[in-house]
Amino acid sequence: RAVEQWLQPCPYEPLKSFVYQVLGQPSIGCPFFTYPASASYHHCCSGGLAQHSLEVAKTVQGMTTCFPEHERWLTAVAGLLHDIGKVRSFLPDGRRTSTGCLVSHELLGFELLVPALMRLEATWADGANALRNIFDWVIRPKQQRPLMPVAMCIQQADMMSAYADNRRRTFS
């Protein structure tokens, strides 16, 4: 419900549809909302993956106020889905699957997004290409300078969310 409330004000219907297409698939959405984000590092409780992902999306929005609105929403959605591959690389208890031992969760995540990206391309080709560019940078950040500098915010927001959760757990 929190993700739906966060996404509701998005003025880009094709982007909202993209998120619903991804998270509406039971094989993706169910684990996304119930799995931990990690086994023991951060957000390691049931539902931690969705909590962490939404924190990243919100932080990205807060960090990108000087950029055009469409770039902010595209990057925030990429932040929301940056760890989506964990639904294939982790088990409900946070241990890695055999696939997760072989392939990064970032790459598995992009693989999961491809069908929805293809549908997004039919209604908003520039948006689909922007997401491809952002996820390309997320998968291999040291390989290139991002054409969309907002992509760098995902990495920072990811670390901030993880560190903040560790701080909460340490001092609670």
Task: Identify the residue ranges that each predicted region occupies.
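Conserved hydrophobic/aromatic pocket- or pore-lining residues that grip, position, or stack substrates
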Residues: 56
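Extended, charge-rich, solvent-exposed interface segments
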Residues: 1-34
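Primarily single-stranded nucleic-acid-binding OB-fold modules
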Residues: 17-19, 46, 106
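Pre-Walker A segment
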Residues: 29-44, 64
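Divalent metal-dependent catalytic cores for phosphoryl transfer on phosphate-bearing substrates
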Residues: 40, 51, 62-170
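Short helix-to-loop capping/linker segments positioned immediately adjacent to catalytic or ligand/cofactor-binding
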Residues: 6-11, 43-47, 61-69
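A generic short-segment signal for beta-strand/edge and adjacent turn/coil regions
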Residues: 24-25, 46-47, 123-124
